[in-house]
Each structure stands twice: as structure tokens, then as C-alpha cells.
Amino acid sequence: MATLFIADLHLCVEEPAITAGFLRFLAGEARKADALYILGDLFEAWIGDDDPNPLHRQMAAAIKAVSDSGVPCYFIHGNRDFLLGKRFARESGMTLLPEEKVLELYGRRVLIMHGDTLCTDDAGYQAFRAKVHKPWLQMLFLALPLFVRKRIAARMRANSKEANSSKSLAIMDVNQNAVVSAMEKHQVQWLIHGHTHRPAVHELIANQQPAFRVVLGAWHTEGSMVKVTADDVELIHFPF
């Protein structure tokens, strides 16, 4: 058996091929797993569990079917869907996890996270993240009428796209010191994360021992998952 990890699907109505690919994944590979972990940015945007978007209801039902089949499903918030709440988690049968979680998998201690907190060189983003994660600000935003939230979210996405266009790729990648610090804080030799859309397996030194950082790919033109078994940790790409 295997434990599966995915991230950065950025599901939205404008990308039906990705949605269809994810549904096939849920109906196939996911049903064979010991557990499924979604490490953030499942959706391109999330403005509240009360959004009646049919895509959200469709995804909740599909994930719930996996959970009901006996495969536990877990979710860590990303930078796009950090407002996904308990209502959607309940509807989809997912368990919400903290932003950093250590798993014991087949004899390995594995740290999982979305990955945006590792991009400490991007000071502008980290300042924005700290602001929008303030509970009082989230409560205020979620109390606004839905149409107002949609306008704010669209403007924020446009601003983010414009800001990122002028940033270097290095700034938007993880900071190596932040990676080592996180792994040593949790005393792990394995880290799995998403966010950067740069799939790879990196070797490093943490806790004065060889360590590995596995980065999930985004679901743009193909699927991406990490498959952890007793024998191996594999980064796998597959067609929709």
C-alpha cells in the first residue's frame, strides 16, 4: 500500500481538463491508497465555504466518496485556499491539518506543509501572508456579501500576478536556511511540500545527516503526486 500526496491543482471552472483529471485520479489511484494528503491550493481561489460554486460541491462529493471508501483524506491550507473551513471539510470528509504536520510513514518521519512559509526571501509576500492570516481580518472578510468578496479576491489575484511578474525566480523559491530550520525543528529527514511549482527531489543536510526535500508539481498539463511506500518515496507525473 501507499500514502499519496498532491498539491497545487488550482481547480477552477476555466480549467475543466484539470478538474476531469482530478476526478479520474480520485476514482482510480486514490482509492488504492492508505491515505490521501492534499497540501494546499486545491482551488485557485476560496472566498468562503458559503460560495455556491457548483465546482466546489462537485469536488466535495468526489473527495467524500474517497473518504467513504475507507481512504482517509487530509488537507493543509495553501496560499490560494487558506479560507477553506470546517463546513467544506465536513462536506468533503477531509480532516484539516495545521500548516506544519509530522507523519510517521512506514518507518520514516516526514514533515508536510504547503511550502509558502519557506519562501522567506519574498518579504513582500510574507508580510501579505501575515496580514491575511489575522483571524479578525478573516472574520471581517467572510462577513462581507459574497459579491463583494468575489470582487476583492479578483483584485487581489490581479495584484499578485502583477507583483510576481517583476520578482526573480530565486526570490519566489524556498530559502535553504528556512528549509533546514524547519526540518531540524521537527527532527525529520524528509520534507514534502508544494507551492513553488518546481517538482524535484533535493538532497541536503539536516540534523547533521543526509535529508531529502520532495517538491510536488502543479497540475498544469499533467498530474503530479508523491507516492510513499515502505520501500520508496517517488515523485510521479502522469497524464490527465
Curated annotation (Swiss-Prot):
Record's keyword terms, sorted: Cell inner membrane, Cell membrane, Hydrolase, Lipid A biosynthesis, Lipid biosynthesis, Lipid metabolism, Manganese, Membrane, Metal-binding
For this protein, what is the EC number?
Answer: 3.6.1.54
What are the annotated GO cellular component locations? cytoplasm; extrinsic component of plasma membrane
Q: What is its main location?
A: membrane
SUPFAM superfamilies to which the protein is assigned, alphabetical: Metallo-dependent phosphatases
Q: How does it sit in the membrane?
A: Peripheral membrane protein
> GO molecular function: any one?
manganese ion binding
Give the highest taxon in the source lineage. Answer: Bacteria
Q: In which pathway does it act?
A: Glycolipid biosynthesis; lipid IV(A) biosynthesis; lipid IV(A) from (3R)-3-hydroxytetradecanoyl-[acyl-carrier-protein] and UDP-N-acetyl-alpha-D-glucosamine: step 4/6
Give the first-level EC class, as a single word.
Answer: hydrolase
Q: Would I find Lipid metabolism among this entry's keywords?
A: yes
Binding-site list for substrate = N79, R80, D122, S160, N164, K167, H195
What is the reaction catalyzed? UDP-2-N,3-O-bis[(3R)-3-hydroxytetradecanoyl]-alpha-D-glucosamine + H2O = 2-N,3-O-bis[(3R)-3-hydroxytetradecanoyl]-alpha-D-glucosaminyl 1-phosphate + UMP + 2 H(+)
> Would you kindly state one Gene Ontology biological process term found in this protein's UniProt entry?
lipid A biosynthetic process
Which residues of this UniProt protein bind Mn(2+) 2?
A: D41, N79, H114, H195
Free-text cofactor note = Binds 2 Mn(2+) ions per subunit in a binuclear metal center.
Location in or out of the cell: Cell inner membrane
Q: Which InterPro entries does this entry report, sorted A to Z?
A: Calcineurin-like_PHP_ApaH, LpxH-like, Metallo-depent_PP-like, UDP-diacylglucosamine_Hdrlase
The protein's job, in short, is: Hydrolyzes the pyrophosphate bond of UDP-2,3-diacylglucosamine to yield 2,3-diacylglucosamine 1-phosphate (lipid X) and UMP by catalyzing the attack of water at the alpha-P atom. Involved in the biosynthesis of lipid A, a phosphorylated glycolipid that anchors the lipopolysaccharide to the outer membrane of the cell.
Q: Which family does it belong to?
A: Belongs to the LpxH family.
Q: Which NCBIfam families match?
A: lipid_A_lpxH, PRK05340.1
What protein does this entry describe? UDP-2,3-diacylglucosamine hydrolase
Q: Which organism is it from?
A: Escherichia coli O139:H28 (strain E24377A / ETEC)
